[in-house]
């Protein structure tokens, strides 16, 4: 089959969950004999497409985008959809419900499409007013114009059922189970079990500020290592830095996956503040190397870590949990081992098989069939 993956920054995966999913799923589909095309954004600062024509068996189509928060995704996906409509494919996977206004073009080209709806983007603090209204409208359009909807967590599936009476295909991400070692931690002046870790974009709904404030209130002897940044959140980033004390180390973005895996594996705890997405790849990566997890208390995180995790809702609880982790390192390490057991439920091979099965169903479509209207039910704002 010809399968197109549209709506992300593309591969090689350097940025977020969608890109990791595209790489892990796409390379497996390609290895299975499918012709996989991945639409990629032109790297920043490059007039020429500096990506290869092929990567891990996937064909790459590199296109530009307007570098602005409100326009980057949609402009790149618009160019990708135009290219795809000219060249055709048997099935398309569009990532991010924000791209839903472009779905009618794919339908007009008779390309069956499944939309991965992502999390509840309209709840993110960076969107207000028109931006928030746009994301809520985009959810409705995705329901109306997709041949299938993909949810990566039960909570997301429940939301679409409640808000739109719309069925979804539930496919999570994978959690690679790794033993990355610790040979490179010395490059950062770190030792295994000698630090707490945060990995997140600096955005309010990821609760990096809450974690840093809570850590500062704690009596922790081990440093807090913070990995991440945000290209459009300068004010929030400044507030995070202002909240830190001398025990907090900011590393910025770490794009070296081997080094990042060693950071996860060597952490005495991994603090995870994400609150509005679905199944989060950073959380899966952490449990896959046995990092003990302290997570923000929402159903998406509890669905992944279950009883192996500890959960917080505010800075005071972060302080308590960090102190408890250092006070009983054996119990903390045992929770990390329990998390490894949960990681076994998230297997990239199984995820890719589910995408392949859905692609085959899409490819067999003769007509769009009856889709939900896209109208919100009265309970849809919950």
What are these regions (language model features)?
Residues 4, 187-217, 225:
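Conserved donor-binding/catalytic core segment of Leloir-type glycosyltransferases
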Residues 32, 330-360:
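A charged, aromatic-enriched C-terminal amphipathic alpha-helix characteristic of glycosyltransferases
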Residues 72-85, 89-118, 122, 278:
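An aromatic- and histidine-rich active-site surface loop
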Residues 131-149:
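Membrane-proximal helix-turn-helix segments that form the acceptor-binding/catalytic region
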Residues 262-278, 291:
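Acidic donor-binding loop of glycosyltransferase active sites
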């Amino acid at each position: 089959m010809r399968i197109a993956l549209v709506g992300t920054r593309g591969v090689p995966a350097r940025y977020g969950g969608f890109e990791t999913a595209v790489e892990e799923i796409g390379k497996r589909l390609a290895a299975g004999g499918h012709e996989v095309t991945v639409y990629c954004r032109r790297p920043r600062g490059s007039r020429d497409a500096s990506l290869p024509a092929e990567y891990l068996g996937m064909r790459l189509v590199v296109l530009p985008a307007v570098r602005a928060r409100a326009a980057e995704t949609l402009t790149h996906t618009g160019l990708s959809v135009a290219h795809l409509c000219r060249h055709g494919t048997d099935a398309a996977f569009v990532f991010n419900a924000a791209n839903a206004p472009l779905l009618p073009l794919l339908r007009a080209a008779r390309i069956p499409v499944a939309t991965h709806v992502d999390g509840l983007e309209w709840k993110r603090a960076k969107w207000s007013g028109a931006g928030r209204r746009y994301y809520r409208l985009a959810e409705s359009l995705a329901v109306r114009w997709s041949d299938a909807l993909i949810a990566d967590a039960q909570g997301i599936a429940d939301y679409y059922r409640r808000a739109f009476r719309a069925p979804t295909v539930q496919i999570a991400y994978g959690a690679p189970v790794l033993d990355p070692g610790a040979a490179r931690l010395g490059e950062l002046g770190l030792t295994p079990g000698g630090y707490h870790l945060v990995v997140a974009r600096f955005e309010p709904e990821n609760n990096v500020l809450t974690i840093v404030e809570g850590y500062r209130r704690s009596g922790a002897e081990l440093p807090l290592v913070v990995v991440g940044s945000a290209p459009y959140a300068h004010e929030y980033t400044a507030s995070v830095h202002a909240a830190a004390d001398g025990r907090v180390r900011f590393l910025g973005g770490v794009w070296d996956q081997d080094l990042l895996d060693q950071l996860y594996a060597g952490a005495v705890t991994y603090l995870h503040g994400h609150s509005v997405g679905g199944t989060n790849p950073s959380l899966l990566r952490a449990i896959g190397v046995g990092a003990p997890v302290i997570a923000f208390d929402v159903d998406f995180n509890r669905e992944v870590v279950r009883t192996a995790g500890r959960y917080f809702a505010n800075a005071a609880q972060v302080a308590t949990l960090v102190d408890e982790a250092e006070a009983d390192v054996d119990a903390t390490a045992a929770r990390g081992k329990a998390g490894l057991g949960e990681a076994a439920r998230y297997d990239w091979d199984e995820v890719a098989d589910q995408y392949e099965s859905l692609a085959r169903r899409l490819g067999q479509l003769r007509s769009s069939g009856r889709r939900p209207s896209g109208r919100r039910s009265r309970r849809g704002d919950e």
